[in-house]
């Protein structure tokens, strides 16, 4: 119900902020979890800028949870809420592989289970939606190396990945796998009054309303997969071209709150690449739509990233049929980001609001 209170984690991130905007536009009241007062001030400033002219302030509040892995961390935040959308992922700064099992895997599991336990204790929550990833469903081999004999779907589950992890991406994947497996086991064992929905986006692309400068868009995020090519970077490490628009990700999360959507299931969010599609296709899109910016060197448009496993395929029919939409194609995803890049100043000349205090 659109007048219900939703607890949202991760609202200060690329995906979470877009979900916050969508919730408010659809009439929900939102209690956003922040980690510090400084984050709250920054979030409210960006919300004011994006939602200007919209009457939302009486439907938005923040609550501080400094440490997501503390027992009962979300209990107070979840009081009197009808839904929880858990988007936040562990914040990892260590480059020491010995830390990654804790930082990626244990923290991810603790956060998800903590949210579920808070939902149970609240006595009011009807559904929890957790943001996972395509890497929570499929092995690295299935995504990066093996053509799909049949399209991969959201019903897939894989065993947990144990350390050591060769690089951070594998540790991140281990966290996503452990999180979904643990959360589903918790639901099966606890049999709470609420249900659970997992969302599994591929590489998320699209306008980032948290960005205020071009410099912000050059920082690493999933948008960087395409923008690095537009900005002339040559990356020797390839990836499968599996992408989705941030608008579609937000839409799925919010529509999943509808009680008409059956709970205790997963949804894969990804557009279907056309045969022969490559990451470098972005160059022809940009040349066609922004020729002056290319000619002037604002968009070098001469980068490269290899496309691997062109034979991988996803079955997203359940997602599109349940939520009643067609995924935004890769071309539109990329052009939205490039258009925003050209609209923004190079650097922020105004007063900076701390995002770390």
From Swiss-Prot:
User: Which Pfam family, just one, is annotated for this protein?
Assistant: Epimerase
Which top-rank group of organisms is this from?
Answer: Eukaryota
**Which Gene Ontology MF annotations are present?**
oxidoreductase activity, acting on the CH-OH group of donors, NAD or NADP as acceptor
What are the protein's UniProt keywords? NADP, Oxidoreductase
PANTHER family listed in its UniProt record? NAD DEPENDENT EPIMERASE/DEHYDRATASE (PTHR10366), STEROL-4-ALPHA-CARBOXYLATE 3-DEHYDROGENASE, DECARBOXYLATING (PTHR10366:SF564)
Chain's gene name: CTB6
Q: Does the keyword Oxidoreductase apply?
A: yes
Q: What is its EC number?
A: 1.-.-.-
Family note: Belongs to the NAD(P)-dependent epimerase/dehydratase family. Dihydroflavonol-4-reductase subfamily.
Annotated binding of NADP(+), by residue: 172
Question: Hey, which pathway is this one from?
Answer: Mycotoxin biosynthesis
InterPro entries xref list: Epimerase_deHydtase, NAD(P)-bd_dom_sf, NAD(P)_dehydrat-like
What organism is recorded for this protein?
A: Cercospora beticola (Sugarbeet leaf spot fungus)
Task: Specify the protein name.
Answer: Ketoreductase CTB6
Q: Describe the function of this protein.
A: Ketoreductase; part of the gene cluster that mediates the biosynthesis of cercosporin, a light-activated, non-host-selective toxin. The perylenequinone chromophore of cercosporin absorbs light energy to attain an electronically-activated triplet state and produces active oxygen species such as the hydroxyl radical, superoxide, hydrogen peroxide or singlet oxygen upon reaction with oxygen molecules. These reactive oxygen species cause damage to various cellular components including lipids, proteins and nucleic acids.
Does the keyword field hold Oxidoreductase? yes
């Amino acid at each position: 119900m659109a007048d219900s209170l939703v607890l949202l984690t991760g609202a200060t991130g690329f995906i979470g902020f877009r979900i916050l905007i969508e919730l408010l536009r659809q009439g929900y009241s939102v209690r956003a979890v922040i980690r510090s007062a400084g984050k709250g001030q920054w979030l409210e400033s960006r919300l004011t800028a994006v939602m200007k002219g919209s009457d939302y302030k009486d439907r938005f509040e923040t609550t501080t949870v400094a440490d997501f892995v503390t027992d009962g961390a979300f209990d107070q935040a979840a009081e009197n809420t009808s839904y929880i959308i858990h988007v936040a992922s562990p914040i990892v700064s260590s480059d020491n592989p010995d830390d990654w099992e804790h930082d990626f895997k244990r923290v991810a599991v603790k956060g998800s289970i903590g949210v579920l336990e808070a939902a149970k204790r609240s006595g009011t929550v009807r559904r929890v939606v957790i943001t996972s990833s395509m890497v929570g469903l499929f092995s690295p081999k299935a995504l990066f190396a093996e053509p799909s004999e049949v399209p991969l779907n959201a019903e897939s589950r894989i065993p947990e990945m144990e350390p050591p992890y060769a690089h951070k991406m594998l540790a991140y994947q281990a966290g996503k796998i452990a999180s979904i497996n643990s959360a589903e086991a918790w639901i099966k064992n606890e049999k709470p009054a609420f249900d659970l929905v997992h969302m599994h986006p591929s590489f998320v692309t699209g306008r980032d309303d948290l960005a205020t400068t071009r410099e912000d868009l050059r920082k690493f995020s999933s948008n960087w997969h395409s923008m690095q090519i537009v900005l002339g970077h040559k990356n020797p490490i390839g990836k499968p071209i599996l992408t989705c628009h941030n608008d579609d990700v937000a839409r799925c999360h919010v529509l999943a709150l509808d009680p008409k959507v059956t709970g205790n299931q997963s949804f894969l969010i990804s557009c279907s690449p056309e045969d022969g599609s490559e990451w470098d296709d972005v160059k022809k899109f940009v040349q066609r739509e922004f020729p002056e910016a290319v000619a002037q060197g604002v968009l070098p448009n001469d980068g490269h990233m290899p496309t691997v496993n062109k034979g991988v395929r996803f079955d997203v029919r359940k997602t599109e049929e349940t939520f009643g939409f067609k995924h935004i194609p890769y071309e539109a995803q990329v052009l939205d980001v490039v258009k925003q890049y050209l609209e923004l100043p190079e650097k922020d000349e105004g007063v900076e609001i701390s995002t770390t205090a």
